[in-house]
Amino acid sequence: PKPDASSSVRGPFKSIETSVPGVRFSETLPLLAQRANRLAIIRSMNHDAAPIHETGQQLLQTGRLAIGGVKFPHWGSVVASQSATRMGIPSNAIVPAFLSNTGVSAYRGQEAGLLGSDWEPAAISAEIEGEPESIRRQYGDTDFGRMLLRSRQLVERGTRCVTVNLFDSLHQRSTWDCHGDPNCGPATLNDYQSKLCPDFDRALSGLLDDLAQRGLLDDTLVVATGEFGRTPNVNERLGRDHWTDCWSAVVAGGRVSGGNVIGASDSTASMPIDRPVDPGELTATMLDWCGANVESLSVTIDKTDLPLIPCQKLTELWS
């Protein structure tokens, strides 16, 4: 948040203190604010590709953009291709469904791509069985709560990689894509306050608490991010439009340094002013955490050898 910026930048929400001195969150995330000491916060995510959903989806999940029709594999497919699997347990799961209508007919980064169909992710529904009511309440009786609870079940049973799509389709729905435009992204910041942020706040907090209570948090890397940010200025419809130049992400678990803040943005959250972070760095980090040898991965395109992931892992998460 930018509490000292003009009202057109800071929007309608106040900022609140967190459990980390000097770090502030939006008032719409009070539970995560209490758990900020468990989070590594990246304030300087950015990319310079086209400002559409599909480019960000590719960069975050494959580490690079498709080249000449070549689809680079989802990070979990890379891990699955290098890992032993347990009978009946998917190594790489997408919950609850693959991304579908996100605006443009283009690759969204959730396929095995050039690795081949043997390594396609498995789509797993968010149907929950065998959990006590107290645990369900911890995550919240919401779609996102059920998705994260299902993800915890998968991790506990041996799935190596889980990707949760809070929304598989964007149009004509109230999603993070808050243009305030009924023809594409109808949500506004009012929807952030009444539904989207409360659901996210409770579900992610519930997941972190549950993993910690089960002794799984140190061995599970949790990453929460979007594929880009939103415009620094609120538009005339009380929405914000696409913005690839700067956004935030959080990482927890995996023995990361809780309370750590990586990077910073300018006074209007328009651009990074310290330690810009490429989405591919998160991809490389997830691959490295799961034991994939990132530096050894390459692909030949038009007789040219290219690294599968052109970025290094984000070592500052552990400093």
Q: Model-predicted segments: where are they?
A:
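Ligand-binding pockets and gating/stacking loops
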Residues: 1-319
